[in-house]
Amino acid sequence: MQKYVCSVCGYVYDPADGEPDDPIDPGTGFEDLPEDWVCPVCGVDKDLFEPES
C-alpha cells in the first residue's frame, strides 16, 4: 500500500501501521481515511499529503 507524506511537517502515514492514536486500524488506505482526518503531528488537512516517492 502507498505511503503518504505531509508536505508541511514530513509525517508519513503508513497504511500498514494505521494510526493507533486516532484510532485508524492497520490496513486502512489513505483514500479510506475519514474526510475530516488531519495530520496527527501538525493538524493540516489530508489534501496537503502527497504520495511518498
Curated annotation (Swiss-Prot):
InterPro entries, A to Z: Rubredoxin, Rubredoxin-like_dom, Rubredoxin_dom, Rubredoxin_ET, Rubredoxin_Fe_BS
GO MF annotation terms: electron transfer activity; iron ion binding
UniProt keyword Transferase present: no
A Pfam cross-reference name: Rubredoxin
Cofactor: Fe(3+)
Residues binding Fe cation, per UniProt: C6, C9, C39, C42
GO BP annotations listed: alkane catabolic process
Keywords: Electron transport, Iron, Metal-binding, Transport
Cleavable signal peptide: none
PROSITE patterns for the chain: RUBREDOXIN (PS00202), RUBREDOXIN_LIKE (PS50903)
Domain Rubredoxin-like: 1-53
Cofactor descriptive note: Binds 1 Fe(3+) ion per subunit.
Family, per entry: Belongs to the rubredoxin family.
PANTHER family: RUBREDOXIN, RUBREDOXIN-1-RELATED
Job of this protein: Rubredoxin is a small nonheme, iron protein lacking acid-labile sulfide. Its single Fe, chelated to 4 Cys, functions as an electron acceptor and may also stabilize the conformation of the molecule.
Protein name per its UniProtKB record: Rubredoxin
Gene transcribed to yield this protein: rub
